Amino acid sequence: LVKTTNRLRSNAPLQGGLIIGNRIPKEYFVTKGTGESEITVHAGSYHLALKSAGIEMANIITYSSILPGIAKKIHKPKEIIHGAVMETIMAVANGHKGELVSAGIINGWLIDRETGHRYGGLVCEHNGNYTLKQLENKLEASLNELYINGFEERYALQNIEMHTSSLTPRKEYGSAIVALCFTSYLYPILA
């Protein structure tokens, strides 16, 4: 490691080494929660929504909305290491006292019409001041738009799941979250 680090610093050409491709999310779970605070959103109601969802101990990173074909849904792990990085596809709605806030995620799998193999998945997130029915309609419309604009000719969209969370805060601030959380990854070795 020291020799490699010294070579990198000197800009000398490296001999050998492992070339790894972009990692691919392999396993995930879905969770949701709500939180309220009299103090603030980010260190208040949002954090308490993460706690309600059971992921408050993690450092959250958000992704865009694609699931690889190898991804598999699992149960939430019993333990998440405090301070671990948790990569998610997340919907978050924040609001004030008396204001309905709703967050949701919808996902479906693209199945190759010719082979029957699972190609990958699409995920859409949405949040706002919606009733659950309004939120569900927006999520369905978003997923349909993604599917129609790039995938419907070759793939069927199947196994659709929707997860929602909503809250009308009684305290000054309120948050609702839904998160698809990745727990493991495949690292392709290229050379």
PLM regions: where:
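Helix-coil modules at protein/domain termini and other flexible surface or pore-lining loops
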Residues: 2-191
